[in-house]
């Protein structure tokens, strides 16, 4: 079975867009791949974090993973910082990376402009990401537009290391995630933009742990147009097209089926059906989350993941040390 790796940062805020574009995809893939799913807490500290909130968010994200249907018997679930070999391998890769290629990363350029005193971690973030991937010899990595450049760098670093020291790493291939196809969920108030937790207007963003009445209200207030035709046309009708995408994502119906279902019906009727289906899905997730969050299931899953990943990562780290000439 081919091996795949994916992870999310523990921001404390998971949107419905994150669920459809990332977590749901993990669930769909868990019978197709040997999946490594991690909480990227070391990546999170490239910007300031409150320590208590960070730890709480880590546990919350694991609980959400499980509540959304990620099966710990089919996936290896772990916390990045609980495997010290990620940092060790990252340093060895940093010494085979160049300042120029790191400083050209689009995310670094964007984020460094927003912070007067940014950390070195913001610059070397992509090398740690490369370590996360290469340490497990994964075959595939799901990526959206914002991370595609980082995966290309990981492939470059792996190829460079292999050429310099001999065959060490498998070169991973990208899987284009839902972020790049029709299931990119947009902001309910500004449907030309991706649904994002950082949006100024929170009325356009649905959160997985949000009050269900609030979610329903946001969907019923979503921006549409004056035509009153439920037709998928993202250029001319971005608002209603976004709602069609949302409805399709939770019902598994095609756009054509949805257009036929709501032919002759007004937007209010359509929005109510969208809200009903979304609330049903998120309500089920929340019910499971509330049972899991304070249970010992989380620690059992993480203990198992830590044990498995540390053994694999240790072997790769020792191999790298030997090839480089470190130690005795």
Spans of model-derived segments:
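Short, Lys/Arg-enriched, disordered terminal segments
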Residues: 1-2, 328
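N-terminal Rossmann-like or analogous alpha/beta NTP/dinucleotide-binding catalytic cores
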Residues: 2-131, 277, 282, 286, ...
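Short, histidine-centered active-site or binding-site loop motifs used for metal coordination
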Residues: 8-10, 41-43, 139-140, 199, ...
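Conserved nucleotide- and phosphate/pyrophosphate-binding catalytic cores
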Residues: 18, 149, 155-328
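Short, polar/flexible loop-turn hinges at active-site or ligand-entry regions and domain interfaces
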Residues: 50-51, 140-144, 168, 230
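Short catalytic-loop micro-motif centered on adjacent basic/acidic residues
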Residues: 76-79, 142, 227
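Short helix-capping/linker segments at secondary-structure and domain boundaries
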Residues: 99-103, 135-142, 248-258
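Internal, conserved structured core segments that host functional sites
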Residues: 107-161, 165, 187
